[in-house]
Structure formats: structure tokens, C-alpha cells
Amino acid sequence: MFAKNLLFRFPKCIRINGYNNMRRSLLQRNGFQAGICRKFGTATKTDVWKGRFLPIVSGVAAASLTAGYLLGKNTSNASSSQDNDHPVVGEHVHTETQSYNEPYMQRHRIEDAIEKKMTSETQPSTDEKGRKVSATENSAPKKTDKEKSSGETAGNILREQIATGKDDDEYARKFEEVEEESSEESAFNPDTGEINWDCPCLGGMAHGPCGEEFKAAFSCFVYSKSEPKGMECLDKFQAMQACFQKHPEIYQDMVGESEEEDAETNEKPSTTSDENNQPQSPPSDNASNPEEDVMNMEKEIVNLTPMSVIKEI
């Protein structure tokens, strides 16, 4: 009966596996619970779920992933647009710090610019220094030469006028031309009546070893009111000339001119014995000697006095 029930219950397994397999499965107690057919197996709930619901679940998962990707992409685009309109978290801290430090940074930038400008102004380049020095060296001799040439020209004109005794428009025109060419500073101020002893036109003669003698003779001639002018200053000019002769290394030009004039005045034609025997001329003929002394003194004054001072006097 028991065997009959087995055959009725498992007819398919007997036909497939044979009698030996049925016998072996009967000997195993767990065969009734786990199922006798191990090769093909029997339909269970797991197999049914896998066969029916697995494709559905896979489709739902794929759809959810696709939807999540699209939703995340839209969310990222929206957040990027919001970032452009609104600062990110912590940006306000950076902005406040920058606005706090900006005045100090601006002050430092201004100080650096001022310091750089002052350095460039106080320290000119080497080329500029060289150009300034060369311009100064070149301009000084030109001015000195011009003053010397104008003084010599004025002296020559006045000496010629004194020698010839003429006073016409020609000499006035020459004086005007010399005055235009001369740019030397005036030593005598007629408004205040003072003499500038530091004037370059005096050639530094007021400060040399014979400066006191020169000042005495020059001031006497300037303030003289006698006719002819400077008649009372003859002794002072002679003292000045004697001082010049004591220092020939400094006043070589002045001593040379005075010696030439003395030699010219001392040269006189030799007289014959007949002339020596002749009686001397009356005293009235020798009355011209003081005038000759005055002429010589005026020539000496002209040689020592600049043109600008002579014209003002």
C-alpha cells in the first residue's frame, strides 16, 4: 500500500530517474520535504517571482535612475543660475575683509607713489648733471668775454674822445651801441648814491691787495663835482698806481699800461745847442701843464673804470 502510494504520487520521477533513483530517494528522509526531482526541480515561489517580477523591477529601477539623472541635471542648472545672482556661502566674509583693508592698501599705494616721485626729483640722472655742468661752464666764460670786450670798447671810445677833444653825435651813437651790447651789472646806483663793490664789472679790484686804494680813488672820482671831474683825486690815483707797481704779479696789465704811458710822456725830441742857448719861454707858455696832468688822469681813470659806471656818472 505504501509502495502504491509512492508510485501514484511520483509517477513522473519513476519514469525519468528509474527505479534506483526512487529507491535512493526513499532511503533519504529529507527527500519528502526537499523534493525528489533535483535535476529539474519543482516550481517554487522564488522561481515564479524571478520569472515574472524581475523584469518589472528592472524597468522601474531604470526609469527611476533616468528620472533622477534628469532631475539632478535640472537642479544643477538652477543652482548655477542662483549662484550668479547670489553670493555663495562665506563670500560676504571675503567682501567685508576686502572693504576693511582697502583704505590701508590705498594709503600705502599713495605713499609709494609719492616716495618714488620725490626720489626721481631729488636724484637727477647722470646725463642731466653732466648737461647742467657743461652748460654752466660754457655760459660763464661767454659772459666774461662779453663784459671784457664791452669794457675795452667803451674805454677805447672814451680815450679817443678825450684825445681828439670832440663831442659829437658819432661818439654818442658809439656809446649807445656799446650800452646795448653790454649786459654787465651796474656798480654805482645814482638813486641811492651807493657803490656795489661786489659788482663783477669792477673785476674784483676792490678786494685785492690794493682794494683800499682802489676804493678811495674810485669813490673820489664818482662823487667828484669839480671841473674837470676828478681833479682833486689825483693823489689817490697815484697812490693806487704805486700799489699796483708793488704787486706786478696781480696787476700786470695795469702796470704795463701805466709804464707805456709814462714812456710816451717822457719821450721828447732832443734839443740842439742853439735851442739850449735860447732863453726859456715865459711862464705864461707853461700854464698848460695842469691841463695835461688832468688829461693824463682822465685817461688813467678811463682805463680803470668800466663803461657802465662811466655812463652813469
Curated annotation (Swiss-Prot):
It is found in: Mitochondrion inner membrane. Keywords: Disulfide bond, Membrane, Mitochondrion, Mitochondrion inner membrane, Oxidoreductase, Protein transport, Redox-active center, Signal-anchor, Transit peptide, Translocation, Transmembrane, Transmembrane helix, Transport. Residues 62 are mitochondrial matrix. One of its GO terms (cellular component) is mitochondrial intermembrane space. Residues 74-313 are mitochondrial intermembrane. Residues 140-150 have a biased composition (Basic and acidic residues). A motif (Cx9C motif 1) lies at residues 210-220. The CHCH domain contains a conserved twin Cys-X(9)-Cys motif which is required for import and stability of MIA40 in mitochondria. Monomer. Required for the import and folding of small cysteine-containing proteins (small Tim) in the mitochondrial intermembrane space (IMS). Forms a redox cycle with ERV1 that involves a disulfide relay system. Precursor proteins to be imported into the IMS are translocated in their reduced form into the mitochondria. The oxidized form of MIA40 forms a transient intermolecular disulfide bridge with the reduced precursor protein, resulting in oxidation of the precursor protein that now contains an intramolecular disulfide bond and is able to undergo folding in the IMS. This is Mitochondrial intermembrane space import and assembly protein 40.
